Structures are given as C-alpha cells and as structure tokens.
Amino acid sequence: MTPLIFASEGFGLNLNIFETNIINLAVVVFGLYKFLPGFLGKILEKRRTTILSDLKEAEERLAQAQDSLSQAKDDLSSAKQKADKIRNDCKVRAEAIRLESEKRTVEEMARIKQGAASDLSAEAARVTSQLRKEAAELAIEKALAMLPKKLDSNTQDNFLKQSIKNIGDN
C-alpha cells in the first residue's frame, strides 16, 4: 500500500513522528511555556505598574479637584454672604439717606414757611403803620381844610377860653 492509496480509502492518519512535525511542535510549545511567561510577565508587570501609577495620579488629581471644588463652593458661599450683607447695608443706607433727605426737606419747608409768615407779619405791620400815618395825615388835612369854614371869631374866642381854662385846671 502506498500512501496514495491510504489517502483515497478514507481518513488517513500519519503516525510517523518525524514526518508530522510533532517534535517541532512540542519543542515550540515547551519553549513558549518556559520562556514566554518570563518575557510576557515582565511586559505585563511593567504595563500593570504603569496603569496603577496612572490610576493613582488620576485619583490624586480627582482628590485635588474635589478639594478645589469644595474650596470654590466655600468661597462662593462666602462671596454670596458678603454680597447679601453689602446689599442689605446699601438698602439700610439708602433708607437712612431718604429719611434724612425728607427730614431736611420738611425742616427747610418749615423754615421757609416761618420766614414767609414773619415776612407777611412784618409787611402787614408796615402796611398798617403806613395806613395809619396816611389816615392821620388825611384827617389833619381835612380838619385843617374845614377848620376855617366852621370857626368864626366867636367860636375861636370860646375855643381859646376853653383851652386856657383846661390848661389852668391842670
């Protein structure tokens, strides 16, 4: 039987170790088993160390970022409180300024009203005095104008006698 016949008659199995390269495969598998773990182990260990280092750095950066975020939140809260305090102080100050302005306005109006009242009183007194003076002058002029018409010589003599008598009694 020739190898060609075996191949044509069914499934053929070649049991010749040297022809099938089983030894070569065994050597390669044994070499991989013996040397590959050391070589790949070093590469994998180096990669594992790098990954762990990167992970540790990332965790540190995360912790720093969280600390920074916490600090920023505290600063924001503090800034909001300061802004609220400033806003409230401004409202109080504005109200105080408004009240002071109203008070000064009322005082100024009272002063102007008082000044106007005193000016009005002074003007009324001046006008009253002027009217009295003019009325007295007018009465004197009228009396002087009527006196010559009403006084005749007998009346003048009686008037003079009466005046002398009054002076003498005093």
UniProtKB/Swiss-Prot annotation:
Q: Does the keyword section mention Transmembrane?
A: yes
Phosphoprotein listed as a keyword:
no
Question: Membrane-spanning regions, if any?
Answer: 22-44
Q: Name any GO cellular component annotation.
A: plasma membrane-derived thylakoid membrane
Keywords from UniProt, A to Z, are: ATP synthesis, CF(0), Hydrogen ion transport, Ion transport, Membrane, Thylakoid, Transmembrane, Transmembrane helix, Transport
Q: How does it sit in the membrane?
A: Single-pass membrane protein
Q: Where in the cell is it found?
A: Cellular thylakoid membrane
Which molecular function GO terms apply here? proton-transporting ATP synthase activity, rotational mechanism
What subunit structure does UniProt give? F-type ATPases have 2 components, F(1) - the catalytic core - and F(0) - the membrane proton channel. F(1) has five subunits: alpha(3), beta(3), gamma(1), delta(1), epsilon(1). F(0) has four main subunits: a(1), b(1), b'(1) and c(10-14). The alpha and beta chains form an alternating ring which encloses part of the gamma chain. F(1) is attached to F(0) by a central stalk formed by the gamma and epsilon chains, while a peripheral stalk is formed by the delta, b and b' chains.
The similarity comment for this entry is: Belongs to the ATPase B chain family.
Q: PANTHER family attached here? A: ATP SYNTHASE SUBUNIT B, CHLOROPLASTIC
State what this protein does: F(1)F(0) ATP synthase produces ATP from ADP in the presence of a proton or sodium gradient. F-type ATPases consist of two structural domains, F(1) containing the extramembraneous catalytic core and F(0) containing the membrane proton channel, linked together by a central stalk and a peripheral stalk. During catalysis, ATP synthesis in the catalytic domain of F(1) is coupled via a rotary mechanism of the central stalk subunits to proton translocation. Component of the F(0) channel, it forms part of the peripheral stalk, linking F(1) to F(0).
Instruction: Identify this protein by name.
Output: ATP synthase subunit b
Query: Could you tell me which species this protein originates from?
Result: Prochlorococcus marinus (strain NATL2A)
